[in-house]
Regions:
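Nucleotide and nucleotide-moiety/phosphate-recognizing core
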Residues: 1-145, 153-165, 172-175
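SAM-dependent methyltransferases
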Residues: 176-182
């Protein structure tokens, strides 16, 4: 699941999913890396204005702009009930799909998340689907306007040291610096 909605205030309101780096949208970096790992079931939580390739499922919280936790709940509602694991990514971390092998190796309890620059990157994680669902939609009702950190606080998460692959791009300056490293 890729979160690709939001207002992107620190990007000047530009859709993060559509920000180009070297001729490719941030979202497309993730989709291409998932395809390279034979991940074929992908849900993107994004408004209709974000173009998705054929075969990629779209979801969006209702009403929109309820925050990332509401987006996660909306994305989970689209998943097949038998899905044991959910890879959760944010479109502003364009290389994060490359963390999947390390996250899978680190998964012990409820999930494994990237640890980068002194922080747990909760939107770069591999989660046990039912545990994630219980955290973001207790009682089947998706939470809104709550931080991801607070919603996932009760989960037993393993941290996985990850290099710059988990870098998230919050400003146009971040995008420029990241592009220079590619």
């Amino acid at each position: 699941m890729i979160l690709a909605g939001g207002t992107a205030r620190r990007m000047g309101g530009i859709s993060k999913a559509d920000v180009p780096i070297k001729g490719k949208r941030l979202l497309d970096y993730l989709l291409d890396d998932l395809a390279a790992q034979q991940i074929t079931s992908v849900t993107v939580v994004a408004p209709p204005s974000v173009q998705l390739p054929p075969g990629v499922q779209r979801s969006l919280e209702d009403p929109p702009l309820g925050g990332p936790v509401a987006g996660i709940a909306a994305g989970l509602a689209c998943l097949h009930p038998a899905k044991e694991l959910t890879l959760l990514l944010s479109c502003d971390a364009p290389l994060a799909a490359r963390c999947l092998p390390a996250l899978a190796n680190a998964l012990i309890h409820d999930g494994a998340v990237a640890y980068h620059e002194g922080y747990r990157q909760l939107l770069v994680g591999l989660y046990r689907t039912e545990k994630l669902r219980g955290a973001v939609a207790p009682g089947g009702q998706g939470l809104r306007d709550i931080s991801v950190k607070r919603a996932l606080a009760g989960l037993d998460l393993t941290t996985c040291p990850i290099t710059w692959l988990a870098t998230d791009l919050d400003t146009l300056g971040d995008v420029e610096n990241f592009a220079a490293q590619l």
